[in-house]
Design a protein with these regions (language model features):
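Accessory, non-ATPase domains that flank or precede helicase/AAA+ motor cores in DNA-metabolism machines
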Residues: 2-83, 100, 121, 192, ...
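Membrane-interface helix/helix-cap signal primarily in integral membrane proteins
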Residues: 2-20, 76, 85-303, 450, ...
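Membrane-embedded alpha-helical segments of integral membrane proteins
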Residues: 19-66, 411-414, 557-605
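Internal/C-terminal transmembrane anchor helices
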Residues: 72-96, 608-631
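Non-globular, low-confidence helical/coil segments that flank catalytic cores
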Residues: 169-176, 189-190, 194-201, 214, ...
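Hydrophobic alpha-helical segments of integral membrane proteins
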Residues: 249-267, 276, 284, 292, ...
Length: 899
């Protein structure tokens, strides 16, 4: 008869039984898998459906655990546990999502002037265009009536943009717009602080970001942050001025962060260095300029320049070492502390608590939270007195983080962190007491300090720190003491060398294992990253960051941190300037990614050489993958989702070009850097031509970033000779009559005429119009062409015949100035793409223009509702929308009337 041993019985020793460790692994894996499946939902179920999943799964798990000893067959029992736990993960995550989604902004409140009262709950972000902040809403009124808003909203208080009642008047791009959108300087934003209560008039909209293949999911990021509406403060002269109602200390950490950031910028004159220090101390990544981010990414050290999981983990490790050292030294005064709690345990728990405080001061962002939960799980398991194998420690930490933050599974940082930790677990030495966050489990008597109480020899004493000082001072003679000092010195040097060797090997292992994953997630990897990190990791973590943090207590230390950062910055800039500093590959499918990660892991593991060599062929799919291209004689047009502006990629069998590059959002951000560069990298494109239709900022804003990424591309445009882009790359004029052929596809410029350059008028009138045809299907890209130019094209018999197209880029985003009836009658497209921003201030495309398209049975695709739009000459009867292809429930569904 089996003898009961807690949860484990002798019967469990049979290979056909469900052993507790295997059962736990099945439960954890199932839970994570269930969460992952739920995150693939395009739409949420009813809330009661998720409740049913939870109740059913919990009931089944209860029965399984109660009757676990009767499950004699291993795999059926494990599969059942996996399935039930997956159902639990699916149901719990769906329930949380449905509860959260119920508080979303009512679409009827979008674009309305709402009077809100609330409290600033996070450190405001100040920029060149104003200030951005988060407001916890306590009350809201619309036209005197109470309305319900999401608990937390993100607002911008901008200078230089506002509204006022006025007569309809022209705007700079030649369009006319409703009077409520006339431009006017707003009241300058006031200095906001966390904890302050404000009353203000705001205009809100649902969270809406750009939706592009392989692009950043802004809506998911806001979902994770708990933001369910974005908008701006109405602060023009015709609006009631925002009113500060008072201050409170309900957010002291955020107020302290803001004060420290202001002190850093007041002390450090170099704004770039000040931004880096602010990022390291208070987690303000927005303080780092884009040019610096480009250098950090090119050298593979971007993870160091913000408070990331690495910083928090290193901080916990260092803090645990210091606390353990102090704990041991306390025995010189009294052994009470060491007898009450071993030094290793004190260091582990103390390091965790201090790391949590560091993460809190860094803003308690979602990545920081994940790191703390992971560290907490590891510490609890390592200090539990049981010898957990590393896969179980890793898996339990993974499950805890996923349970607390399910949407972390969709974030690149999550996978990089856990793969790195898993690789270090798998390739490192066995866990032991040298691990400051863990340590070997101590015998029960040792944990009580029994050996020390019995006066045992130091070698057999527990790692409490109590025995070491007493035995040290009780050793007899002076000569022996000197010899011991020499031995300690030699041992110390040997330990330093050993630690450096271990650190170098771990960096190499991480680089090797994460390279395939980085290529999958970012389509780019730094070839100089190993060298850069070998210098930057110890320098930033052991020199720059401690000095920057100590500067909070004594400001002159920020001067030393500045010098240390400047030296590192110069070295990184030199490495980034190397032509071979980075390598980019096209985005590979999931099977390639899995193979690549396995290949990297095999190469990094402590295995015989012939086993590790198997990792090389597994890496090849990631490195050599090329996306499918149009066949010879075919072409495709991809309209990127870039907001208010134009940006399209045209591809043939072996060539490609970009037509316009979208808007410039701010001094540090534009559509080229945000959208086009990542998209071109993911597609594996080296473009032949960049054509800029005309000089308006919503068409050329991203050009510098695209040109920097594509040094081989020719620049063709209608910009004037003195334009600043001419200094970046000399532009060729686009002229009617120009033509070329790629892979059986003909390209022809229809506008402007040479005479237009002699007497240029409005920039829109100079738009380059490009016709693309394979003899069967045709696309027409019309820029911001206006009525006069449209009619001129229609009036030319030769040109009119060539206007007929299957696909049309709507001229001027659907403005009243364009899309005349005769022009549409000549083009006769099946599809027309209107690239415009969601709820843009020009109301593009305007309803009267859309009516003209409807009258002619032309399907208008609007980018806010479609995202990136792809049209292919091989399938001319349909347009593929990114928002439909990759739909997830947290993404914004655009109401047609609101576009």
């Amino acid at each position: 008869m089996a003898t009961k041993k807690g949860f484990v019985t002798d019967a469990f020793t049979s290979h056909t039984d469900i052993r507790p460790a295997r059962l736990l692994a099945g439960l954890l894996l199932g839970f994570v898998a269930g969460v992952a499946v739920q995150l693939q939902q395009a739409e949420l179920f009813e809330r009661l459906s998720y409740a049913a999943w939870v109740v059913t799964s919990l009931t089944g798990l209860g029965v399984l655990l109660w009757r676990v000893r009767r499950f004699r067959l291993l795999w059926p029992g494990l599969l059942l546990a996996f399935a039930l736990s997956a159902g639990l993960g699916f149901g719990l995550t769906g329930w949380r999502a449905s509860v959260y989604n119920a508080a979303a902004l009512n679409p009827l409140l979008e674009g309305q002037d709402i009077d809100v009262t609330g409290q600033v709950v996070a450190m405001p972000q100040f920029g060149e265009d104003g200030v951005r902040f988060r407001l916890a809403v306590s009350s809201a009124r619309l036209k005197g009536e109470n309305v319900s808003l999401p608990p937390q909203i993100a607002l911008g208080w901008y200078s230089g943009f506002g509204t006022r009642p006025a007569t309809v008047q022209p705007v700079p791009d030649g369009d006319t717009e409703p009077a409520e959108f006339s431009l006017e300087l707003q009241r300058q934003p006031q200095l906001l602080r966390a904890g302050e209560r404000w009353q203000m008039t705001v205009r809100l909209k649902a969270p809406h970001g750009n939706s592009n293949p392989h692009g950043f999911d802004y809506e998911l990021w806001l979902w994770e942050q708990g933001i369910q509406a974005t908008g701006y403060v109405r602060a023009s002269k015709s609006d009631a001025p925002p009113k500060k109602l008072g201050s409170s200390w309900t957010h002291p950490v955020e107020r302290a962060r803001q004060s420290v950031r202001e002190a850093i910028f007041a002390r450090v004159e170099d704004r770039k260095i000040a931004g880096v220090l602010a990022a390291l101390v208070v987690g303000d990544q927005n303080a780092i300029e884009r040019a610096d981010w480009d250098v950090f990414r090119a050298t593979g050290v971007a993870h160091l320049m913000s408070i990331s999981g690495l910083h928090i983990t290193m901080f916990a490790w260092a803090a645990s070492l210091v606390i353990g050292w102090l704990w041991r030294r306390s025995a010189r005064l009294s052994p009470v502390l060491c007898l009450a709690l071993p030094a290793s345990s004190a260091g582990a728990w103390g390091g965790l608590l201090l790391a949590a405080g560091y993460a809190l001061f860094a803003g308690w962002g979602v990545p920081a939270q994940r790191t703390i939960w992971m560290l907490a799980t590891v510490v609890v398991l390592r200090q539990s007195g049981k010898q957990w194998p590393w896969p179980m420690v890793w898996l339990q930490a993974l499950a805890v983080v996923v349970a607390l933050s399910p949407w972390a599974l969709m974030q690149a940082g999550f996978w990089l962190s856990f793969v790195a930790v898993g690789v270090l677990f798998a390739t490192g030495p066995p866990q032991g007491k040298d691990d400051p966050l863990g340590g070997r489990a101590l015998p029960e008597a040792n944990e009580r300090g029994g050996d020390f109480a019995r006066g045992s020899d130091q070698k057999n004493a527990p790692d409490s720190g109590a025995g070491s000082p007493i035995n040290h001072w009780s050793r007899g003679q002076n000569d022996a003491f000197k010899r011991q000092k020499i031995d300690v010195f030699r041992t110390g040097v040997a330990r330093i060398v050993a630690h450096l060797a271990i650190a170098a090997r771990e960096q190499w292992v991480i680089t090797l294992a994460l390279t395939p994953l980085s290529l999958l997630l970012f389509n780019q990897v730094s070839l100089v990253g190993l060298l850069a990190n070998a210098v930057a990791i110890p320098w930033v973590t052991l020199v720059v960051t401690p000095l920057a943090m100590a500067g909070v207590l004594w400001a002159p230390l920020w001067d030393a941190a500045t010098l240390a950062t400047q030296g590192l910055s110069l070295g990184l800039q030199w490495l980034a300037s190397l032509s071979w500093a980075t390598v980019s590959v096209a985005a590979a499918p999931l099977w390639c990614a899995v193979a690549g990660v396995l290949g990297g892991a095999l190469l990094a593991m402590r295995l015989p050489l012939h086993w590790r060599a198997l990792g090389v062929p597994l890496l090849l799919p990631v490195l050599l993958w090329q996306p499918l291209r149009p066949a010879t004689g075919q072409f495709e047009v991809l309209g990127a989702d870039i907001g208010q502006g134009n940006a399209l990629i045209v591809r043939t069998a072996t060539h490609s070009m970009v037509y316009d590059t979208g808007p410039k959002f701010s001094r540090e951000s534009d559509a080229g850097n945000r959208v086009l560069v990542p998209l071109l990298r993911a597609l594996g494109e080296n473009i032949d031509i960049l054509m800029l239709s005309h000089r308006d900022s919503d068409h050329i804003g991203g050009a510098p970033a695209v040109l920097a990424m594509q040094p081989q591309a020719r620049l063709v445009s209608s910009i004037e000779d003195g334009h600043e882009l001419q200094a970046v790359r000399k532009s060729e004029r686009c002229l009617a009559g120009q033509s070329w052929s790629w892979d059986g596809v003909d390209f022809e410029v229809l506008h402007p005429l040479p005479a237009d350059y002699d007497s240029p008028t409005k920039s829109n009138a100079m738009s380059c119009v490009l016709r693309i045809s394979n003899g069967r299907q045709t696309a027409l890209l019309a820029g911001d062409l206006e009525a006069a130019q449209e009619l001129r094209l229609v009036g030319n018999p030769d040109t009119k015949l060539r206007l007929k197209s299957d696909f049309l880029l709507v001229p001027h985003h659907g403005s009243k100035t364009s899309s005349t009836g005769p022009f549409l009658d000549a083009v006769q497209p099946q599809f027309a793409l209107a690239q415009a921003g969601y709820r843009n201030r020009f109301n593009h495309p305007v309803e009267s223009v859309l009516a003209r398209y409807r009258e002619r049975n032309i399907t208008v695709i609007q980018s806010p509702g479609c995202g990136a739009a792809a049209w292919q000459s091989s399938q001319p009867q349909k347009v593929l929308c990114q928002r439909e292809l990759a739909r997830r429930y947290w993404q914004h569904t655009v109401i047609k009337e609101a576009q």
